[in-house]
């Protein structure tokens, strides 16, 4: 393998809200800048990026107590847009042309998601940040990531998590948990592993979308994975 050439041309990067969470606020702009610098390095090698960002640093629907689930999920969608605009602003400051596209129309500060427009932006060197998930309740941003990946023809979904791989159990609770380097969609579902929600896993399996789960404790991990480093967990078909 040519270690100077990226393994993937078009990537859907899923960032959790926790990944960009600040200790003294909801956003860590210094860390977002580090992410931008790494994306720029990848883009200089011809890599195209679509990004789905979660909202866990601001709001989680399941934390809404007795709140109506649909309303709670609507709040989550709005929170993803706050994160998306924050990413866009930081990327632009770092010299990256970025556009926010949302599943729910918010024309004052984002473009509506249109598949062909998103692909045109990618082909023209822009990072496309998808807000509002899929625009419907009861659907996670993990599921939104694999759906958008299918729509834009991404080579891989990079799931940047606050844990460095998929394990046989939660390593924070079970000291005997073992890291998994490669696993199939069916195995994840059969073993009930909490790598991502089952809807996202099933959709990825049905549409043969490869997923690479890795830790974002170091932003350089994005570059390393794209360049073919063996780290984290690769999820794919049989």
Residue ranges and their predicted role:
Residues 1-238:
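C-terminal catalytic "cap/lid" subdomain
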């Amino acid at each position: 393998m040519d270690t100077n050439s990226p393994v993937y041309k078009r990537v859907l990067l899923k960032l959790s809200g926790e990944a960009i969470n600040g200790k003294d606020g909801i956003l860590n702009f210094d860390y977002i800048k580090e992410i931008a610098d790494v994306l720029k390095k990848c883009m200089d090698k011809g890599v195209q990026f679509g990004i789905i960002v979660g909202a866990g640093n601001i709001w989680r629907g399941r934390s809404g107590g007795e709140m109506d689930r649909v309303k709670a999920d609507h709040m989550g969608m709005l929170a993803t847009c706050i994160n998306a605009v924050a990413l866009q602003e930081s990327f632009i400051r770092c010299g990256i042309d970025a556009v926010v596209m949302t599943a729910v129309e918010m024309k004052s500060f984002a473009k509506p998601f249109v598949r062909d427009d998103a692909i045109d932006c990618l082909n023209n060197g822009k990072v496309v940040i998808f807000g509002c998930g899929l625009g419907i309740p009861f659907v996670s941003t993990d599921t939104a990531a694999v759906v958008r990946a299918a729509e834009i023809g991404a080579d891989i979904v990079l799931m940047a998590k606050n844990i460095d791989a998929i394990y046989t159990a939660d390593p924070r609770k079970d000291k005997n948990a073992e890291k998994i380097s490669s696993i199939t969609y069916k195995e994840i579902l059969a073993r009930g592993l909490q790598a991502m929600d089952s809807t996202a896993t099933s959709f990825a399996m049905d549409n043969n979308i490869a997923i690479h789960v890795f830790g974002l404790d170091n932003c350089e991990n994005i570059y390393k994975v794209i360049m073919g480093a063996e780290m984290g967990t690769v999820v794919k078909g049989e």
